[in-house]
Amino acid sequence: MSIIYDDAPLEDRIHRALSDTFKHRAIETAQDVITGKRDALVAEVDNWEDFRTHAAAIRDHVLENLDYYVRQFATNAQKNGAQVYFAPTDNDALDCILDIFEAEGAKSCVKSKSMMTEEIGLNTFLESHGIKPVETDCAEHIIQTAGNAPSHIVVPALHFDRTSIRNLYHEQKGYEGTNDPEEITRFLRKTLRPEFMNAPIGVTGCNFGVAETGSCTLVSNEGNARMASSIPETQIVVMGTERIVPDLRSLDVMMKLLVRSAVGAKISGSFSINTGCRREGEADGPKNVHIVIVNNGRTDILAHEFRPMLRCIRCGACMNSCPVYRHITGHGYGSIYPGPMGVVLTPLLVGYEKTAKLPYACSLCGQCAEVCPVKVPLPNLISQHRRNVVSQGYVSPVEKAIFTAAAATFSNRVTYGALTAAAAPAMKLMTGKTNQLDRGSTWIPVLNGWLASRNLDTMSSKKFRSWFAEHKKQEEEQKRAETAQALTDACRNNANREEN
């Protein structure tokens, strides 16, 4: 699977998503539950905003000195016995990983959840070379078994319910149990345990690489990441160039923010700091550790106005609060990175040729920026994408002509006045006594998309400027009358005092 997994037009993806009632219920429930938990935990932290500001400063500091911290991380990782590789592109990363498999003579591996391996399309690549990757994260295993795409970066199987999971495992894995989650989990544990014990290689991601120690960290709620990184003789870590923190103190700040923002919990079920290979006398851990640091366009992002996007710590808080994600679901975006962060990141990684309309899957309400733990200005970056799409010529000639005409109309007072004067009676003629354009008016060009799902009130026959002028005149007359009355009352009071 590559970054874009659905090449259908955005409109088609949205229509498909809107027709799936289960996905809507699942997304709404997940958003409400996770956001509720997150808000409750955030309220317990008196200096939450200070944490956000500090975390954003840490991320900016790393990005400003990325060469230094990547070198420091690589040097210390090598001192710990790991082999470090730098992959400029996704293809370079895939070739590097394949070389490791071939050197080990491995034909299978166990994997923990990793957005970077999804970004470079590792599973599909390995399968094309006769290598069997086994996802061990529960949700990722469901996705892999179904041959489906993830709908969330933290909860990828959000679009499955317990019955569909039970039926999937019955058809694909011979499961004969009920749809009880605990029973399904026990079956999955029994299925995966031999894979862990027999796999020659474990492939993991890396939430944060710690520069001062050369350590790779893994956050998990199931413990599968710890097993994938400790049981196989060889571990391959795949991480993005920007996934670095300077030291353990900075890591502590990030972890406080990450787990609260991602799932509304104080701590994760499992958190590992892996530092190098198994040492003499240690009972477990990999004998060989390979760390593949993937650039894949990140230094290009670092060089322009989208640089703040590289602060992102992949918590998913932005999509948990996004009204557009709530309606079109993760699959409406057609990318492994959905939601507001995906609207920004996907065009940066694959270009506007395939994603020119994606920046418009946003209401610009700003809620994503309010909840982002590292203060990524997502609405501003999405607006910049829109400007780029227009300036670089990725809009259709018809759309360009429409907006050019609109600009000419709205910038000319005479033309604008004449148009609005004609529009009000025309709309009343079309609506009759209802004073609303509704679904019966979808034949009207330009407005048909709006009217298909909501009504539009007719324009008032009185212009706002006229109403405002009259209202202002009335206010001035009232003030003059009040002033005159006040003077009259004052004179009367003075006269009364003189008489007395």
Model-derived segments and spans:
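Short secondary-structure transition/capping segments
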Residues: 130-135, 250-256, 289-292, 367-374, ...
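Ferredoxin-type iron-sulfur electron-transfer modules in oxidoreductases and energy-metabolism complexes
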Residues: 281-309, 324-441, 500
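Short capping/connector residues at structural and topological boundaries
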Residues: 213-215, 249, 276-278, 338, ...
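The feature marks the mature, well-folded catalytic cores of soluble enzymes
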Residues: 1-308
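Extended amphipathic alpha-helical segments enriched in small hydrophobics
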Residues: 315-319, 365
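Generic, well-ordered alpha-helical scaffold segments in large soluble proteins
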Residues: 72, 76, 80, 96-100, ...
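Intrinsic disorder at enzyme termini
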Residues: 6-34, 44, 402, 408-500
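Phosphate-binding glycine-rich loops and their immediate beta-loop-alpha structural context
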Residues: 312
